[in-house]
């Protein structure tokens, strides 16, 4: 007899909750599941689970990628893991933990058990969200895409295209997933002791990225570029993005709502915890930017759900060992990972993870009769122009160097641009017209450093495009 990945997930979650709430050992909880006559009310939606199983069990949908493993004397194929959630209530409505037809019970579930490097998909969670919320930067803030420091004699960090692009808006930096601006924005959030403990604790405790390790607070690479000491799971990453999909409120996940005994008595009640983390305005600024990732970037376009506004973030790790996409529509949130179980490069020219995500999510929306949908813009935002060189209100000399974006009311530029003498440093001062910062908080300061708290660790850049 075989169980689906959904059944495996429910089984393991109920066992864990029986152990925690009833002080059972694992063997006692497992025995209760098999012999206790329990009735479990699942959050899984059979039509969604069916769509995912049908699509991801067909090798024709997963690309023709493979490599020959000499040690095993056989070909191996990239695996896939995907989670689909309702972000408003935390319900897991579909889950797949591997490619192909599933066999057996309680087999390895890559959606909940595989801990992988997230690459750039981590940036909205650990770097930009708090920076928007605390007005450290706006979408129109101008920041340098240039080396932050020398590392082993080389410029660090690098970008996927091997180039640096000079001054640009935060909106452009996040849309294109450029690495140096992300590092600079993280540095604005550094603690007095030189670590990023506050950022780490927020991600681990509030956004429930529980696989993060204490070592991830040290250095710049872990929390800015997703070069973590251990990694994260697909379920963790998908759940964390609920903070944006649910308009600023983080919603924990669940695969069941309650468990009853054979006599109808409630044994477990699974109420999800919700926490207001960001303002609706902050969440919308992120959604607006991540919509552009899907609309404009090479790897993001394939994730577009037909007729429905779609937002999301790609992630790719060094040597293309891991490919991620975490995205959402006004209705559903989903995350996907694609790669080999053992670190081996997948194709860099094709973003299978966004192709799969877009195809599966389009089928799910169509099955639900959803043919359109827009993200709701909250009050408290203004649409304002800015000079793309200074970030100030455009003046007469700014012709050809202007753009529009959303600002939280009160953070939009108010001073007219008076020249193009260089970039404006993002400042912890919520006044967006501030043009200087203290040296220890200046993210545009390039340096050669031997201070361990400033060292990238590890040094490999995220090759995200």
Where are these regions (language model features)?
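Non-catalytic, structured segments within soluble enzyme domains
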Residues: 1-43, 50, 205, 209-210, ...
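Mid-domain, small-residue-enriched loop/turn segments at the edges of structured enzyme/sensor domains
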Residues: 155-157, 190-238
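Conserved catalytic neighborhood of penicillin-recognizing serine enzymes
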Residues: 136-199, 250, 262-292
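Short active-site loop at a secondary-structure junction
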Residues: 40, 78-79, 103-125, 138-143, ...
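Second-shell loop/turn segments in exported
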Residues: 35-43, 109-118, 157-163, 169, ...
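A penicillin-recognizing enzyme superfamily signal
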Residues: 42-71, 82-86, 94-95, 101-114, ...
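Active-site SXXK
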Residues: 52, 89-90, 116-143, 173, ...
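Ser/Thr/Gly/Pro-rich low-complexity, disordered linker/stalk segments of secreted
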Residues: 416-465
């Amino acid at each position: 007899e075989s169980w689906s990945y959904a059944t495996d997930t429910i089984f393991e979650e109920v066992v864990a909750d029986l152990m925690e709430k009833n002080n059972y050992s694992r063997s006692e909880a497992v025995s209760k599941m098999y012999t206790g006559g329990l009735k479990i009310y699942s959050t899984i939606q059979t039509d969604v689970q069916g769509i995912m199983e049908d699509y991801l069990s067909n090798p024709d949908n997963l690309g023709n990628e493979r490599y020959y493993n000499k040690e095993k004397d056989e070909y191996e194929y990239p695996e896939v893991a995907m989670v689909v959630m309702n972000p408003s209530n935390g319900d897991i409505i579909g889950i797949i933990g591997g490619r192909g037809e599933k066999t057996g019970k309680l087999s390895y579930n890559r959606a909940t058990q595989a801990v992988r490097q997230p690459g750039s998909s981590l940036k909205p969670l650990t770097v930009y969200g708090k920076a928007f919320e605390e007005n450290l930067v706006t979408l129109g803030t101008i920041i340098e895409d240039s080396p932050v420091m020398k590392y082993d004699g080389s410029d660090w960090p690098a970008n996927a295209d091997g180039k640096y692009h000079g001054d640009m808006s935060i909106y452009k930096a996040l849309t294109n997933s450029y690495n140096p601006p992300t590092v600079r924005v993280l540095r604005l959030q550094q603690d007095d002791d030189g670590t990023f403990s506050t950022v780490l604790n927020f991600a681990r405790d509030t956004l429930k990225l529980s696989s993060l390790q204490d070592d991830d607070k040290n250095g710049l690479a872990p929390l800015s570029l997703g070069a973590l000491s251990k990694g994260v799971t697909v379920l963790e990453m998908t759940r964390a993005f609920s903070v944006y999909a649910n308009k600023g409120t983080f919603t924990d996940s669940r695969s069941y709502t309650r468990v009853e005994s054979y006599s109808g008595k409630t044994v477990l009640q699974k109420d999800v915890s919700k926490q207001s983390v960001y303002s609706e305005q902050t969440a919308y600024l992120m959604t607006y930017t991540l919509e552009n990732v899907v609309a404009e970037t090479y790897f993001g376009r394939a994730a577009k759900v037909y007729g429905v506004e779609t937002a999301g973030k790609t992630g790719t790790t060094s040597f293309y060992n891991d490919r991620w996409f975490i995205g959402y529509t006004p209705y559903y949130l989903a995350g996907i990972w694609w790669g080999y179980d053992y670190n081996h490069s997948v194709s860099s020219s094709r973003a299978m993870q966004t192709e799969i995500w877009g195809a599966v999510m389009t089928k799910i929306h169509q099955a639900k009769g959803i043919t359109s949908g827009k993200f709701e813009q909250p009050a408290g935002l203004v649409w304002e122009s800015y000079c793309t060189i200074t970030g100030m209100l455009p003046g007469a000399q700014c012709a050809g160097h202007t753009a529009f974006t959303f600002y939280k009311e009160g953070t939009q530029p108010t001073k007219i641009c008076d020249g193009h003498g260089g970039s404006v440093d993002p400042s912890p001062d919520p006044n967006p017209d501030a043009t200087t910062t203290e040296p220890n908080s200046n993210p545009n300061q390039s340096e050669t450093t031997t201070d361990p708290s400033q060292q990238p660790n590890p040094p490999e850049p995220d090759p995200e495009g």
